[in-house]
């Protein structure tokens, strides 16, 4: 990516952070990531050996984790937010992240860190057409040339730009990129006890 120079510095920084979270941190949830940051390995937790000030600091950090968990409503999957300014190339960045996941998922199919399908939300139906850039741009600008054939042969795009458009994805299929607006997504029950999270993420390692 740095050799080709197609991505801008904010895109490169965000992508490197994404890879770091996936490969070094092991694809943690936000709560787990914060827990590691607040309580690094080796942090003394023995009450008898801590000062009152240290105990108060630990208490405050634990309260932060509890508040974070409440805010996230106990989400059991990574839910990171990458905030980039307008015009910095968020669409291309999303595509790069998706391609990275798909390529690694192909090489390591049992590794649950890497997604095998992607769902891209647009804030409104008018934005969906602009997201076709994910499909149309030159993949070799963001991935090594030897992987472009794999992507062009296996990617399946689904644009749900109309209310009447139905999603037709084969159960168990991989490398689907579904682009829709938030109003369009309807989670179908797969069982009497299913909920939205279970439907979107039935088995984490298969995503």
For each of these PLM feature ranges, what is it?
Residues 1-207:
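RecA-like P-loop NTPase motor core of helicase/translocase proteins
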């Amino acid at each position: 990516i740095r050799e080709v120079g197609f991505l801008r510095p904010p895109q490169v920084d965000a992508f490197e952070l994404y890879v770091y979270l996936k490969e070094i941190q092991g694809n943690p949830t936000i709560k787990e990531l914060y827990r590691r940051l607040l309580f690094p390995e080796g942090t003394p937790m023995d009450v008898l050996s801590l000062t009152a000030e240290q105990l108060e600091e630990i208490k405050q950090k634990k309260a932060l984790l509890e508040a974070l968990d409440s805010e996230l409503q106990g989400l059991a999957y990574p839910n990171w937010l990458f905030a980039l300014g307008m015009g910095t190339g968020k669409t291309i960045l999303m595509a790069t992240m998706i391609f990275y996941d798909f390529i690694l998922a192909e090489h390591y199919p049992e590794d649950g860190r890497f997604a095998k399908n992607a769902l891209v939300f647009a804030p409104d139906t008018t934005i969906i057409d602009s997201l076709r850039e994910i499909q149309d741009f030159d993949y070799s600008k963001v991935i090594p040339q030897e992987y472009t054939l794999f992507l062009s042969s296996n990617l399946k795009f689904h644009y749900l730009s109309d209310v009447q458009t139905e999603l037709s994805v084969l159960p168990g299929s991989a490398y689907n990129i579904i682009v829709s607006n938030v109003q369009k997504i309807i989670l179908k029950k797969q069982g009497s006890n299913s909920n939205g999270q279970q439907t979107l993420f039935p088995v984490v390692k298969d995503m």
